[in-house]
């Protein structure tokens, strides 16, 4: 069966994302991988657009804020989760204030990751459905004129 959801993983450090990759491989999710903000931008400008972006806080050509800006311009609604190597309260607050769906550190548990992913994917799907409903043409009835 074709996966219902897709995730874009944006990182350049394979050593840090090994466990997350293993978790994603066990779920019915299509996973794409890019190594930079520029590559993420190209992927978010095409259809079908991923439902969720999991991005490293630091990238070779930018950071999480660049990915959030790119995601805001994506062709479809997409959520972003920022992943940091350390628990940093200031970074967490900045990430959430700038509109990310969530923030995770490398020290996550499998149940926590699965729960966060499910919430983020469901939220993106609801936003896409609402957007599609708002874009649907409203049928116009012909006026009945009595002569």
Feature-to-residue mapping (PLM):
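CheY-like receiver
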Residues: 122-147
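Two-component/phosphorelay signaling modules centered on CheY-like receiver
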Residues: 5, 13-35, 39
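Short amphipathic alpha-helix used as the core "switch/output" element in two-component signaling
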Residues: 65-77
């Amino acid at each position: 069966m074709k996966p219902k959801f897709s995730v874009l993983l944006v990182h350049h450090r394979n050593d840090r994302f090994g466990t997350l990759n293993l978790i994603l491989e066990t779920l019915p999710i299509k996973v794409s991988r890019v190594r930079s903000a520029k590559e993420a931008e190209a992927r978010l400008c095409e259809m079908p657009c991923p439902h969720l972006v999991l991005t490293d806080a630091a990238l070779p050509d930018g950071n999480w804020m660049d990915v959030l800006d790119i995601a805001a311009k994506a062709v479809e609604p997409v959520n972003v989760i920022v992943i940091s190597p350390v628990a940093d309260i200031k970074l967490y607050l900045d990430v959430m204030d700038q509109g990310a769906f969530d923030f995770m550190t490398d020290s996550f548990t499998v149940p926590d990751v699965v729960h966060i992913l499910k919430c983020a994917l469901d939220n993106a799907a609801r936003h896409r459905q609402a957007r599609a409903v708002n874009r649907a043409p409203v049928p116009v009835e012909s006026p009945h004129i009595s002569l």
